[in-house]
Structures are given as C-alpha cells and as structure tokens.
C-alpha cells in the first residue's frame, strides 16, 4: 500500500469457541501478540482465538452458551474484553493447568455449521447400543455420495444410516467432507489451517509475569468473566439463531431473485425475467427433480398470454399427456413467490393428491413455502395462518369446499391468490360435480382478486364454462407422442380415419397362429395383441369389470411362453416378496401366478399399498402389462406403448366419448416411445355404435346442482346463509344466477323457473329445521330474510349430507342415553357412513357368527340399536321375520363389525377372509369411516349438548385414519408412507418424523428394500415439509401468546405508550 493512503483495518471473523476443551492444545502466544502494534490490535485480539483445535478423531459434542459468540465480531474488538481474554490465555499456559486438562477433547469447529433446527444428537439416543459408538462420525456427514439429481441437499444423518458409512468408499473422507480432512500430509490446506500453522511456528515467549498474575487473580477474573459472559449470553438469546453461512447466502440470493421477479411480473413489459418471472432456481429445480430442461412451444405460448399476465381467469384444454400440469405449477409458483399469496389446487382423487404432495414438497423446501394436504381426514379448518411463508393447499373436491368455507368464515379468502382445478370436466359429474361448482361459485362471488385456472383433456361446451368462470380459453391439439387409434373386428384391424367414408380404413390381419384350444380360451385374440409389444414395451388392457381384469390376467399367463419368466426374474421375485410383506405373509393367489410373467391386475379390490407397489413396478418396467378398470385412466399417470380396450363397455354401460379419450390418451410415453397405439376390440353388433363413439363430439358438461338436491342446491343455500354471504331470498337468487346452473338454466329447466326452485329449496330447509324465516318486508319475496339454526350450522360445518343430518342428530342424541364405552363398537357405529351402509348387503351367516363372538357388553350395543341375535339367526337360516327392523340400522351395524375387527387386528387380510369381502373394499370402508368421523366431530363441535363426543371422536378419528400400531403413526403422517413402508422404516431405526426429515435418500435406498431413489427423495422432502409446518405452527402460537393484547385496558390513555412499552418488555423477556 502506498504511503499516505489510509490504512485498512481488517475485521477478522471469529470461530465459535469452547473454552473448556481448547486450553491444553493452544499454541503459545507470539511476541507480536504480547506487544501488539497500534494498527494490529484488533487482529491480535482476534488471533488469540484462532488456535489449532486438534484432530477430528477426538471431537465430541459440547454445548455451552459460549457457542453463541462465534458470529459476533464486535465482542472481540473491545480492548477490555481482549485484555481479559489474553490474561486467561496466559493463565492456561501454566503447567498444572495443562496437566489437569491433558485428557480433554476438542470440539470440531466444522460441526458448528451443522447446527440447524434439526439436530443429530436427538437421533443418536434412539439407536441400538451397538451402533451408538458411531454417532460422533455422523455429525460430519452432510454431503451424500454421488449426488443424484434432486439429492444435492444437505442432510443430517440418523443412526440407522451408520451401516452405509461403515463401507470404506462411503466414509467421510471418501465423501470429501472438508470437516474431516486432516492437515498433516494434506498438500492443500485450508486458509484457516494455514493461519493456525503460521502461529504455531513462532517461538514461545517468556510467561513468568503472566503466570504470577494469573495465579494471584484467577478467581477474581473468573468471576468477572463469567458475569460478563452471562450478561452477554442473555442479550445474545434475543437475537435470531445463527445459521450456516452457505444457507444465508442461498436465502439471500433466492430473496434477491424473487424481488426481481416481483418487479418483472408487475411490469407491463414483456420481459418476464429469468424463468417466467420466477427465480432461476425454479428452472434448476425442474431440471434436477423432474428432468424438464425445456418447455413445449404451447406451454411457452400459454404462459405468455396477455390474459395470463393480466391475471384473468383461464381455461385450457389439451389431449392427455400434453403437459398441462406444468403450466399450472409455474402459475402457482408465481403466485406463491412473486405475489406472496396462498394457492389452492383441487384434484379429483386422494391418490393424486398424495402424489402431488410428494412431488411438490421438494420445491416447497427449497423455495420457502408450505405444501399442505387436505384429503380424507387430513386438513385443518380453518387453516393455520402462517407468519411469513405462504401455503399451497392440495385438496380433493370435498375438502376444497370445506377449506373455502373456512376461509370465507374467517374473512381470509383474499389471501387466496389462485385456485387451480384439474379435470375441470368433473363439474358435470354427479354430486362431486355439484360440490365443485359450489366451491368455484363462492370464490367468484366473494373474492374479486382470486384467479381461477381450469384444465381438462375432455371439454365440449367450453362457452358455458367460460361464461360461468368469466374466463379466457386456450386450446391446442399438441401431443408429445403421436397417437394412432385402431379398431379390431374378428381377426381384422382397422385404423381410425376421419377422412374415410365409414370412419376407418383397413390396416392388417392378425398373423398369430392360434390352436383350437387357444381360440376357445382367447376369442378376442388378446394373446396375439399383447405379445407384439411385451415384455420390451408396456401395455395396458382396460376391462369392463374387476373380475374380468383378474380373469384376463390369468388367461394371458396360461398361454404365454415360459421365456417371459426369465425377463427381469430377480426384480419380479422382489415384487412378490414385497407383496408378501405387505400382506403379513399372504399374497393374492392371482398375483402370485401372474407377476412372474410380468403381468398384474389393477382395480379397487387391491389395497392402497398393493396398488402403489404394482404401479411403481410397472413404471420401472419390472411389470410390462396391467389389466385394469376405467378408473386407472382418471387416476395416476401410467402410460403405455399400447392400450387395448377389451370391450366398449364400463360394466354394463356403453362407453362415453370422454371415457374413451381418457383411456386411449394413456398410449405413448413422452421421451420413451416414438408412437402410441390404442386398439378397441368390438363385435359386429356394436360396430355402428362404436363408429359414432369415435367420430362424435364430446359429451356436454351439465350442472348437477339441482339434480343432486340434498348435496347440491340445499347444501349451497344453507352454507350461503351460514357464512353470511347471502341472507335474503333476493340475494340468494342473485347468487344462483351466477352459478354454472344459472348459465345453463334455459337448457336444464323445463318445468320450473330458477326462482321457483330457489323458493322450494328454502322452504324445504325451513321445514327440516335447518333454517328459520325472519319477518319479511314490504316486498315479501325478495326481502324475506333467513337465518341458520344450530342444527343447520352444525350440518354445514360438518359437511354432512342433508339427507342424513336429522338421522345423525337422532342417533347421537340416543347415544347419550346409554353410550357404551367399554369397547369402541358403539362409537364406531355412530361414525359408520350412512351412504355405504345403504349400498351394502350383509352375509347373514358371517353376521350371525360374528354376533355370537361378541362380549355381553358388545351385544348390549346391538340391543340398544334394536338388532337382536334371534333376528340375525332367522335371516341366516332363511326364515321369514315378522318383526320389523330398520334395514339401514342392520346394515350399518354389520359394517361396524367389520371396522371393529379391523381396529382390533389391524390386518386387512384376516378381516377380508373373516367377512368374505374384498380387501380393497375394506380399506375403502376404513377411509370413508375416518372421513365421516372427522365430519361428525365438526358437527358435534357446533352443538353444546354433544360436548361429550368431542374428545372421544378426536381419538377415534386418529385410530381410523391410520389403523396401525401406535409406534407407526408418526411415520404414517408423512405423505406417501403407508403401513408396509412404515414397518420397514421403523425396523431400520427411523422412529419419528425428525429421523426421516434428516435422512439421506441414498442411505434410505440402500437400507430399505424396494425403495427407489425417487421415492426416497419424496419421503425425505415430505417429512421435512411436515416438520417445518409443525415448527412454524408452534412458533406462531408462541408469538400469539407473547403479543400485547389490542384491547388491553389503558391503551387509549396518555400513558398508554409507556405502559405498552413496559408490558411488551415483560412479555418478550
């Protein structure tokens, strides 16, 4: 530096220190340290802390309040503190002091960077004794070996992962962890190590004066030092906890990019920033986690539409597999990150909700937003109001409706910036469509700032939907893989050709040689069609019924060559083994015969664990063919090279064009296949009807709001009055005019007008005691007001079907007279769904046998319900019964027996055999009971007379939701972890959410059988998200408790500022 220039005083960052373990290994101070120059005083004070800490082998966990001072440079710049610290350094050089502490270990300074909210030390205590000795090694392992895409995050390692790192190539040194490298023999030393070595090479000074001074004043200085440190520790606690520097840098960079994206998205310019107004990190995450490097042209066009930039409502439609979901995800991320608003995504089925939760949790962890599940019995009403981060709610149709109601009731709907609806065409499908219509109508009516995006592959009357949603429309015929449609009549295959006179042209004849026996067993020539593609390519065979799926799978295996058994034989054996583990030693006999050939069936008769396992095996190519029902086409994405429709029927109903398009849309896998094929098998008698099917327009989407009376228009009116959206007849009529039904009223209404239907529905609700009519004004029609009764409030809060609300009230009221709590049977009966009971038909012999095995107390429950053993015995014997018994009560009690047995045994297979019911049906019954139990709980919360049920139903709902041993429940809270997987994780040492949140996906893959990398990453991400949600909720509750009450007496007076300030100080301390 040239003379005359100002000298730069460099601030030296200070490592965290732990005085008790460093004394014996400190290097002696240099002469420069004893006689500091004027311009190096700060460096000398800081230099006394930069000492060599010893080798990592002796590292041990030492937590003290001194760790808080590591990042506070200002503490070291005080000359007085530096002097005190220097005196202490000299005192520690005394021989007796060194001897006394000669055996002390040192703390690994690198491990300070691992001190996040999730600590490894809590995991070590839960490990087996023989593995705990490796616990200290794990604190250094935060870099996974051979990072896969999406696995580049830092994970703390729980005890169950020790076996992975005992392998030499997986050791900390092999992984390249800088915290475990030794300085000796290392040609590339870190800057810190070089600095330490430069001090240790200096000659030792004379310490006579410091020794005498330290010996005489050690006690006084120690007391003074402790007092100062105690005071500073108290001040430090009020600060934000220190995080690793790398995390701060990442968050700062992300925050800066989000700020730039906010300005870009609000700017009228067409320049959208790095990635459609989003940080470049979003683009990187799509590459890492999903392998998406570039968007399709139509996706870019859609995202840059002027209507999208102006946040207008949008409907877009493309063929299946066209990439619709990616556009919706980018729009959701814009809302969450750039506009800082919550988002609601509505999906049709629970399985799809869970799949989407798993895939988006990694984005939430990296980008700083919550992903919350609202499906089945999961979901909190009203949702937690987050302090800083925003929430992405992923919900089924029913849960989305309850969520919107809760947001309207708490005046928080304005926080919802975007609603995304997948499979928008479902608005025209029965009661679920009516609920979806009500949800969207309420959002449109009560919030002018919430944007709605709807997408579907099968839409016809888009104009009606546009009018309802006030939306723009975008469509494209893009498919990443070309689809060729064929028809098979006898042995001839025709290609669908819209230009041909009869809609099809000749393609080819089947050349497969059939024996006479094979022709009888396989009249549709399925063996010939599937052997053209399997086992090298995948194939889906859609069948009319569940039983037909199983029969076709077995038939194919009988006539396939034995060579198919050798294809990926080892992996298929592993699938059988996994099925056996899921079934507690039992495997479906059909699957046991078909899986070795690479074939399986897929329908609702499987348990969710079995379905998930078979879907994963199919996706990875272990299974090459699935025989399935039409529900697979609308469920999870399982594409195939060839799709075969066994018949143009679903059960006994002829196929609709919407259903046909969804099924054939599964043909062709983007990035894998160059083309996709669909073949519809038909007989001559159905030929004309099939030609109309493939060439005709899609079915019109119509409102079911009035057709579904109790679940539709009545439930809508009750909630409108309960939420105070509308109170008078005129307001309700105005609301109805803006619904999808209001848009289509000219088409749908033949006999009554919309006004007459509105009046009739309100009168019916009043007669049932759900509404009460107030005095009317001069204009008795429009100005007639209504208010909701307590029963009505409970019904709409609990989302109870109004056809059963009065029955539920009577059952709960009767239960109070003699509730049997010695067992769960009585409570289970009260929470067994009414609609499932109406559809069931008991096996009377099984019913009689199970009744006889009840204890006297449990039989007393049946007696209270009016069902006697003699009645069931007569029904089992086929005798006539003169005594009239309510059929619904009898059926409901039978289903209660099934649920009661399941809760006691927690084994679907044994209960399935006991009651002669499909295991999939039993699991669906369990899920329905858990959901209805949650509804009954909310119903009881609104009625004081049912206070006794509240605590009882909370526990029952939890038991029905998980139906496993208590120790597995914490693991099953993680999305995507079902009973079989939870058992594997528990046995491997993962006992809590904290374990999973800190897990290394690579170690999970090696530790847990049949777990893919993708699944491992999703489990870890979902666990992290759940843990963050819980931590955020607890922090919010704590802040709420410490917040100064707004209605505190005296706040309005002249001395309120002083009083408020004083009260705030007390609260925060």
Swiss-Prot record:
Entry keyword set: ATP-binding, Chromosome, DNA damage, DNA repair, DNA-binding, Helicase, Hydrolase, Isomerase, Nucleotide-binding, Nucleus
Keyword Iron: no
Record motif DEAH box, residues: 422-425
Any one Gene Ontology cellular component term annotated for this protein: site of DNA damage
GO terms of molecular function: ATP binding; ATP hydrolysis activity; DNA binding; single-stranded 3'-5' DNA helicase activity; single-stranded DNA helicase activity
Residue ranges annotated for the Helicase C-terminal domain, each copy included: 525-717
Subunit text: Hexamer. Interacts with POLN. Interacts with RAD51B. Interacts with RAD51C; promoting association with the BCDX2 complex. Interacts with the replication protein A (RPA/RP-A) complex. Interacts with RAD51; stimulating HELQ DNA helicase activity and ability to unwing DNA.
Compositionally biased residues, Polar residues: 157-172, 197-210
Organism annotation: Mus musculus
The EC number(s) this enzyme carries: 5.6.2.4
Ranges annotated as biased composition (Basic and acidic residues): 131-140, 179-196
Purpose: Single-stranded 3'-5' DNA helicase that plays a key role in homology-driven double-strand break (DSB) repair. Involved in different DSB repair mechanisms that are guided by annealing of extensive stretches of complementary bases at break ends, such as microhomology-mediated end-joining (MMEJ), single-strand annealing (SSA) or synthesis-dependent strand annealing (SDSA). Possesses both DNA unwinding and annealing activities. Forms a complex with RAD51, stimulating HELQ DNA helicase activity and ability to unwing DNA. Efficiently unwinds substrates containing 3' overhangs or a D-loop.
Family to which the UniProt record says this protein belongs: Belongs to the helicase family. SKI2 subfamily.
Basic residues bias (residue ranges): 7-19
Protein name, UniProt field: Helicase POLQ-like
Helicase ATP-binding domain segment(s): 305-477
Reported phenotype of the disruption mutant: Mice display Fanconi anemia-like phenotypes, characterized by subfertility, germ cell attrition, interstrand cross-links (ICLs) sensitivity and cancer susceptibility.
